[in-house]
Each structure stands twice: as C-alpha cells, then as structure tokens.
C-alpha cells in the first residue's frame, strides 16, 4: 500500500499564510474604487475575500519597504510620526490608518504633511511618475484626500518605490476640498444603501478587466447567494 504524499515545506507555507476575512468597515484605501457596487458588496460582507499566500507576502513586503522608506526620510532630517493613526468616517462605519505624519520636509519646512508610501512594479512606477498619482492611481489619490480632510492637513507627501529598481518617486499632493466632499458623500451613499440595484455594475460583461479579477464577481454577475 503506497503512502500518501507528504506536504512539502512550500505546501505548508502556502496553506498557513493564506487568509480570508471581511473588513470590519468601509476602508479609506478603497473609497475611490471605480465601482460603487463593489464597495457595497464589500461593506455588506457579500463575499469572503481570500488573500492567497503570494498576495499576503506582497502585502508584507510592502510593509517592509515602507519601513525602509521611513528610515531614509529620517536620514534626510524629516520627522516621521503617527504611523497607523486611525481616522474614522461616516458614523464610525468607515475609516482607515495612515502611514504617518511628516514634518521638516525640505520643500515645506514649516508645514505638517500626511505621509503615504506605496511600492509597485516597474510599469506602474513609471506610469505614476509620468502622469502623477491623481491620474495614474486615483484610488491612492482618493485615499489621501480622505485622510487629509479628516486630519485637517493641506498637503500629502506621496512616496513610491519601484520594486524592480528601488528608485524612489516623491510627489506632493494638495488637498482638494471638492474631491473630499464627493468621497464623504460616497461613504454615506454606500453605507446607507438599502438595495444593491441602487448601484449599477461598472460593466455587464463579467470578462471585462475590472470585473474579471473582482472578488465579488460571482455574487455580482452570477447571482450566487452570499454565504451569510
């Protein structure tokens, strides 16, 4: 009788580092997502997001890179604090954590700025550098607007690191009151939604790029009943 194959080290790592749990709130890092229907599904726990082992490592690598960026900022004489400061949104059902608050920035030595760090692949890095974060990564831009508005800050220091080359890109993002108010209204609309049909699909084609890789695809396009 042949024995069952034993799990390898990689098998065990992949099993133990795969996690899945819903967010307890509507995240500030998602509020500028292009699909409002997705945000309703996410807030209402209509699906169980699953973070595979590889993606989990990518997230943890991002945390490690953020620490490296912060150390470099401090070497440049910039004061960093307030890491993971929480901000709260509509009736406590929305919110998020900032990467920090910085002061003594050479470009704005007398001001206090929001700090947000992101690591990305080479193509995304070049796109952000060429177009600016507002156009290239509107979700990041919206995240910073929410945090600046909640913390009463006029500017954000956005730092991106190219994971292929380790190059840095720094951009200063100014507070946009119109965008902030729009996102605050969006928070309320998502949280107070009574029926998913209040929000049309971003596309009726499940193979469209944003839908194809969406965690809520089965619930949204196939009509599968949520687990709970």
Residue ranges: model-predicted function:
Residues 84-91:
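Short, solvent-exposed loop/turn elements at beta->coil junctions and helix N-caps
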Residues 55, 129-135:
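Short glycine-enriched, charge-decorated loop/helix-capping segments at active-site entrances
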Residues 35, 69, 73, 96-131, ...:
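Conserved catalytic cores of phosphodiester-cleaving nucleases, focusing on short active-site segments
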Residues 134-137, 141, 146-228:
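Metal-dependent nuclease catalytic regions and adjoining charged, substrate-binding loops involved
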Residues 2-3, 53, 96, 224-228:
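Cys/His-rich finger/ribbon microdomains and the adjacent scaffold used
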Residues 44-46, 118-123, 161-165:
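Short connector loops/turns at beta-strand edges and beta->alpha or beta->beta junctions
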Residues 73-81:
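Short secondary-structure junctions
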Residues 1-68, 76, 207-210:
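Charged, glycine-rich intrinsically disordered N-terminal tails and low-complexity linkers that flank
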């Amino acid at each position: 009788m042949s024995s069952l194959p034993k799990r390898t080290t990689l098998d065990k790592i992949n099993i133990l580092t795969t996690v899945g749990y819903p967010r307890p709130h509507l995240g500030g890092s998602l509020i500028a997502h292009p699909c409002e229907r997705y945000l309703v599904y996410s807030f209402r726990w209509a699906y169980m997001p699953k973070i595979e082992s590889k993606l989990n490592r990518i997230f943890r690598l991002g945390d490690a890179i953020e620490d490296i960026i912060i150390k470099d900022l401090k070497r440049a004489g910039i004061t960093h604090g307030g890491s993971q400061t929480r901000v709260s949104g509509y009736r406590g059902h929305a919110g998020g954590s900032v990467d920090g608050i910085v002061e003594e920035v050479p470009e704005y030595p007398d001001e206090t700025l929001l700090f947000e760090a992101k690591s990305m692949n080479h193509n995304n890095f070049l796109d952000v550098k060429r177009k600016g974060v507002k156009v290239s990564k509107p979700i990041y831009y919206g995240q910073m607007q929410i945090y600046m508005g909640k913390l009463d800050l006029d500017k954000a220091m956005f730092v991106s690191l190219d994971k292929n080359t380790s190059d840095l890109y720094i951009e200063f993002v100014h507070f946009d009151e119109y965008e902030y108010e729009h996102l605050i209204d969006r928070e309320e609309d998502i949280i107070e939604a009574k029926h998913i049909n209040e929000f049309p699909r971003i596309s009726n084609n499940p193979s469209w790029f944003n839908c194809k890789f969406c965690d809520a695809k089965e619930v949204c396009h196939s009509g599968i009943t949520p687990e709970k």
